[in-house]
């Protein structure tokens, strides 16, 4: 009987996701016991500024990965969209379970859809990716940054001067909220999701063959291949958190992956969007990035990063 220490952030969503994975793993192998160790990450500690200003990818995983490398914990469950495109040496994503709904949702006062929101409506989001795409569709909107867990954000919509907020459908679903709280599901055609949105990443040490063997039984091949394409695109674009970047892949029954990538300026005035097809997920991701870079997306990323550095200097 082996006792597995599972690292998790303290947030309700993180704990819910971790407990869901543990339940699945216990069903697959009753010989393992699991114990959760709570870990506070940098992203949890800093709540008064936008995520893009706090630092690059890895805000919600770095401390957890350090605990894994030191042997303090054995594994962790992350939201895939929080994962950096390159993992520390010695760690690996051992498994990606079946993806939840990858879409973003709009929740508004008076149940008004995005197109029906009044001129200059205030929309809450903490994501540059969401705000850039919203402003592309509705340049009149006022984007107001909003942080905190799902319950906190829903409360702020009620009590503060937001007309609407944007959240991930997967988070709402995992927290037990029913679809009737949602005003509108935003189609990927209008609001492309974050890379890996709706998917979980189960991470462990690459040397832990016992856990890797167990994880393989929870892995979903469709999710793994499509998310791999998205992450290859993100890695090749070197976007980080400071630039609005999105990627979403689908796969047909013949194994052909269709990846749509997007890079935008924060004001939504410049948007590069491309769709690439192929059977090799890594190659599809790289090709999408190469096509977009050639058209100017890489230059836009470099410009946005430079402007941010100049602003902070």
Swiss-Prot record:
Domain of life (superkingdom): Bacteria
Catalytic activity: 4 porphobilinogen + H2O = hydroxymethylbilane + 4 NH4(+)
Note on cofactor: Binds 1 dipyrromethane group covalently.
Pfam families reported in the protein's UniProt record: Porphobil_deam, Porphobil_deamC
Entry EC number(s): 2.5.1.61
Keyword Transferase in annotation: yes
List of residues that carry S-(dipyrrolylmethanemethyl)cysteine: 241
Pathway where this protein functions: Porphyrin-containing compound metabolism; protoporphyrin-IX biosynthesis; coproporphyrinogen-III from 5-aminolevulinate: step 2/4
EC class: transferase
GO biological process terms held by the UniProt record: protoporphyrinogen IX biosynthetic process
Family matches, as CDD domains: PBP2_EcHMBS_like
Cofactor(s) this protein requires: dipyrromethane
GO cellular component: cytoplasm
Cytoplasm is among the record's keywords: no
GO function terms (MF aspect): hydroxymethylbilane synthase activity
Function comment: Tetrapolymerization of the monopyrrole PBG into the hydroxymethylbilane pre-uroporphyrinogen in several discrete steps.
Recorded family membership: Belongs to the HMBS family.
Subunit structure, interactors included: Monomer.
Name assigned to this protein: Porphobilinogen deaminase
Source organism per UniProt: Bacillus licheniformis (strain ATCC 14580 / DSM 13 / JCM 2505 / CCUG 7422 / NBRC 12200 / NCIMB 9375 / NCTC 10341 / NRRL NRS-1264 / Gibson 46)
Record lineage: Bacteria, Bacillati, Bacillota, Bacilli, Bacillales
Gene: hemC
């Amino acid at each position: 009987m082996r006792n597995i220490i599972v690292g998790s952030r303290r947030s309700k969503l993180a704990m819910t996701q971790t407990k869901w994975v543990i339940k699945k793993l216990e069903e697959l192998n009753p010989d393992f016991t699991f114990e959760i160790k709570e870990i506070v990450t940098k992203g949890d500690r800093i709540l008064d500024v936008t995520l893009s200003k706090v630092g690059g990818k890895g805000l919600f995983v770095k401390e957890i990965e350090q605990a894994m490398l030191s042997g303090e914990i054995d594994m962790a469950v992350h939201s895939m969209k929080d994962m950096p495109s390159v993992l520390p040496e010695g760690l690996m994503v051992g498994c990606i379970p079946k993806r939840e709904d990858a879409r973003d949702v709009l929740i508004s006062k008076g149940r008004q859809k995005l197109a029906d929101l009044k001129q200059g409506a205030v929309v809450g989001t903490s994501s540059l990716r969401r705000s850039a795409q919203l402003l592309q569709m509705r340049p009149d909107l006022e984007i107001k940054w909003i942080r905190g867990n799902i319950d906190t954000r829903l409360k702020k919509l009620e009590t503060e001067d937001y007309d609407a907020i944007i959240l991930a459908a997967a988070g709402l679903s995992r927290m037990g909220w029913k679809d009737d709280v949602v005003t509108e599901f935003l189609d990927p055609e209008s609001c492309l999701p974050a890379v890996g949105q709706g998917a979980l990443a189960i991470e462990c040490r690459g040397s832990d063959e016992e856990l890797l063997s167990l994880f393989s039984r929870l892995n979903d091949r469709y999710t793994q291949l499509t998310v791999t394409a998205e992450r290859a695109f993100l890695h090749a674009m070197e976007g980080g958190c400071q630039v609005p970047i999105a990627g979403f892949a689908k796969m047909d029954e013949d194994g052909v992956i269709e990846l749509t990538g997007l890079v935008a300026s924060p004001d939504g005035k410049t948007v590069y969007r491309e769709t690439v097809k192929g059977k090799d997920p890594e190659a599809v991701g790289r090709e999408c990035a190469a096509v977009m870079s050639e058209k100017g997306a890489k230059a836009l990323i470099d410009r946005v990063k430079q402007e941010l550095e100049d602003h902070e200097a």
